[in-house]
């Protein structure tokens, strides 16, 4: 375990160097220096995934289209920034500068009306700072005469400190509009202005300004998290005391039974009765081992992502650093999955080593690949910028083929050779004991409801903020809270899974291996149900493109956390079961 923690630490250092934020030395300017101004994407405000290139709308284009050089993470998040004709020399203020003047045809007017009616939202970039603005506004107070207004003058405000840009904003109070009437042609004149003003904010903290904007409900947020934290502490204490008290009584009863004379001998009962079967390995050893190994890899990835977030790697408009970090972490931690999977597989007496490695390497990647192909096909049909270019897909596949898969093989070989034999406190009998009939409310489906609901209830408030960030326009920057919530989730999962495993053994049901894994991961059932509720009743998302991305990628996210939490549930149950049977004197 210490080796794994050290490995995660080293990997985080490597990832930090790969996705490191550009040095502030590249953001120094002299007065009147030209700073490139990029226009990125446009799309419906309600559908954050449905984005299109800026010039799919009939704005006046530059004489030649020059795309901004993009990193892997920027491509994955659908960025398609183009150098525009806007010119903002450093520290140079001006009024009503003309961008262009041209004629809108009938079809161009209809395109703008459609975009304004769907609340199209545009993103622009200046010195790596994001600028957001609607395309126009609509007056629908009279439904019989809806009027559309296009922004034709945008006033920009710039804050600077010395020779560096600190913030860029749009003065919404002084935006000018032009009505898009039903004429066949409209002459459109686009203008803009710039106002530069000094500030005391430091460049190194310029992203804090965006964090302040996006965290107005910080106090409510912290209050809800602390409420969940204290509830979890009480739940953990209650379950721990209850289990310890029950186990103490069990040990006392079993000790009395062992001390009785042969004439008064009583047959074992409860969880002691299944001591000869409790360490009998489950069916589908290869699949179970693969899940287990991948689960440890995912735990490492989440810990790495959280560590990088606390180091300030993921700030607003960070060029897709989180996507890049996720891919690099997945590739570099593949050895962990191979090692843990092979180690468990050897303990179970498996001998199909090649199949074990292949299954470990593809059990998550294969469903992910199917989802990417499906969603990418829809995005290409819609001509959206979220459609991944073929070269990008080849690049990601190459990373997996030449880094991820080989590390899985190396980890598998190491796990096979370095792992020790499985040490069970009790000897397993030759023939499995028949499981007695169990009441319906004690069976696995009911266990799933209990095991999934309690961890979900501890995190559902945080899910709202996470969903607003991932599937909305909010920016999540409270990574300290996220770490705390993750620890709460792990803690509740451990407590509930261990308790359910004990009750299952008490009913003389020794088939706890798969049950503990499924119970641990059952929280994702409620997470996916919440995602359905969020889509239809909280968000305003619509359309096939957005729905395809939303529901398919939520399936993958839930599958990810099913494996992660399932591994946590099983591993904690394994430690618990070993402990109680080690303390029991068995015949």
Swiss-Prot record:
The primary location reported for this protein is membrane
The answer to whether keyword Signal applies is yes
- Alphabetical GO biological process terms: asexual reproduction; cell-substrate adhesion; phagocytosis; protein localization to membrane; secretion of lysosomal enzymes; sorocarp development
Instruction: State one Pfam family annotation.
Output: EMP70
Per UniProt, what is the membrane topology?
Multi-pass membrane protein
| A single GO molecular function term of this UniProt record | transmembrane signaling receptor activity
Q: Which GO terms describe its cellular component?
A: membrane; plasma membrane
Tell me which domain of life the UniProt entry assigns to the organism this sequence originates from: Eukaryota
Q: Looking at the keywords, is Membrane present?
A: yes
Q: TM spans, by residue? A: 223-243, 294-314, 319-339, 354-374, 390-410, 448-468, 480-500, 524-544, 556-576
Report the induction information: Isoform Short is induced by SrfA.
> Which UniProt keywords are given for this protein, alphabetically ordered?
Membrane, Receptor, Signal, Transmembrane, Transmembrane helix
Q: Where is the signal peptide?
A: 1-23
Which InterPro entries does UniProt cross-reference here?
Answer: EMP70 (IPR004240)
Q: Where in the cell is it found?
A: Membrane
Q: What does this protein do?
A: Involved in adhesion and phagocytosis of hydrophilic particles.
The protein's matches in PANTHER family, at most eight in alphabetical order, are given as: TRANSMEMBRANE 9 SUPERFAMILY MEMBER 1, TRANSMEMBRANE 9 SUPERFAMILY PROTEIN
Give the protein family: Belongs to the nonaspanin (TM9SF) (TC 9.A.2) family.
Q: What is this protein called?
A: Putative phagocytic receptor 1b
Q: Which organism is it from?
A: Dictyostelium discoideum (Social amoeba)
What broad taxonomic lineage does this protein's source fall under? Eukaryota, Amoebozoa, Evosea, Eumycetozoa, Dictyostelia
